[in-house]
UniProtKB/Swiss-Prot annotation:
Binding positions (substrate): R12, L13, A14, Y15, R70, Y127, R131, S135, R197, L198, H199
Protein's name according to its UniProt entry: Pyridoxine/pyridoxamine 5'-phosphate oxidase
Matches recorded under SUPFAM superfamilies: FMN-binding split barrel
Pathway membership, UniProt: Cofactor metabolism; pyridoxal 5'-phosphate salvage; pyridoxal 5'-phosphate from pyridoxamine 5'-phosphate: step 1/1; Cofactor metabolism; pyridoxal 5'-phosphate salvage; pyridoxal 5'-phosphate from pyridoxine 5'-phosphate: step 1/1
Enzyme kind, highest EC tier: oxidoreductase
Cofactor: FMN
Species lineage: Bacteria, Thermotogati, Deinococcota, Deinococci, Deinococcales
Keywords in alphabetical order: Flavoprotein, FMN, Oxidoreductase, Pyridoxine biosynthesis
Length: 218
C-alpha cells in the first residue's frame, strides 16, 4: 500500500523570486514570451517548451493534455500531433484552444488563447522528416491515437511490422493523419508569483491594430 498523503491543505510555498512591473513588459507579447522561454531554457528547466493544451468538443466538454511547442513566431504557436487524436477531433469541431506554460522554478506561468488552424502540408512534412527516425515510425504505429488496444504486445508487434516495412535507409513517409496546428494567439497572460499570493498578472489582448495591456487582480 502506498504511504498516505499528507494534509494537502497545509502544503504551500512562498513565491519570492521576482516581481513583474508594467515597465518590465515588452510591448509585443511574442517577444515577451520568447524572452521568458529563453530564460527558462538558460535556467536548465526540464522541457520548458512543454505546455498544457486545452480543447473542447462541440458540446463544450473540455480535455487537456501535454504537448511540445515546436514553433513560436509572428504567425503563432505551433505543435504537432495525430489529426485523428482526441484533440484533433476537438479542434475539427471547435477550432480554438488555450495553452499553459508553467515554470515552477521561475515561479512563472504563461497562458495563450486563440483560434487554431492546420499548418501547411509542406511545413508538416519538413518537420516530420526532421524528427528522429524512431519517432517517424512511431507516428504510424500509434494510429489510431487514443483508440483502445489489447495490450502493449500488440503495439510492439505493429511497430516491428513497420520497422520491417521501412528498413534503415528507406524514407518513412509522413502519414496523412499527422501534422501541425498553429494557434494564432489573440490573448496572452503573463503571471509572476509574489508573496502572500498577491501575484503580478498582465494580460495582452489583440484589438485589430495593436495590443492592449492590462494589469489583472491576482
Amino acid at each position: 500500500m502506498p504511504d498516505p498523503l499528507p494534509d494537502l491543505s497545509s502544503l504551500r510555498l512562498a513565491y519570492t523570486r521576482a516581481e513583474l512591473r508594467r515597465a518590465d513588459l515588452d510591448p509585443d507579447p511574442l517577444r515577451q514570451f520568447q524572452g521568458w522561454l529563453g530564460e527558462a531554457l538558460q535556467a536548465g528547466l526540464r522541457e520548458p517548451y512543454a505546455l498544457s493544451l486545452a480543447t473542447a468538443d462541440a458540446s463544450g466538454r473540455p480535455s487537456v493534455r501535454t504537448v511540445l511547442l515546436r514553433g513560436a513566431d509572428e504567425r503563432g504557436l505551433t505543435f504537432y500531433t495525430n489529426y485523428e487524436s482526441h484533440k484533433g477531433h476537438d479542434l475539427a469541431q471547435n477550432p480554438q484552444a488555450e495553452l499553459l506554460f508553467f515554470w515552477a522554478d521561475l515561479e512563472r506561468q504563461v497562458r495563450a488563447y486563440g483560434p487554431v488552424e492546420r499548418v501547411s502540408e509542406e511545413e508538416s512534412t519538413a518537420y516530420f522528416h526532421a524528427r528522429p527516425r524512431e519517432s517517424q515510425i512511431a507516428a504510424h504505429a500509434s494510429d489510431p491515437q487514443s483508440a483502445p488496444i489489447a495490450n502493449r504486445g500488440a503495439l510492439e508487434a505493429k511497430l516491428a511490422a513497420l520497422q520491417a516495412q521501412y528498413p534503415e535507409g528507406t524514407p518513412v513517409p509522413r502519414p496523412d493523419f499527422w501534422g501541425g496546428y498553429r494557434v494564432r494567439v489573440r490573448e496572452w497572460e503573463f503571471w509572476q508569483g509574489r508573496p502572500s499570493r498577491l501575484h503580478d498578472r498582465f494580460r495582452y489582448t489583440w484589438e485589430g491594430e495593436g495590443w492592449r495591456i492590462e494589469r489583472l487582480m491576482p
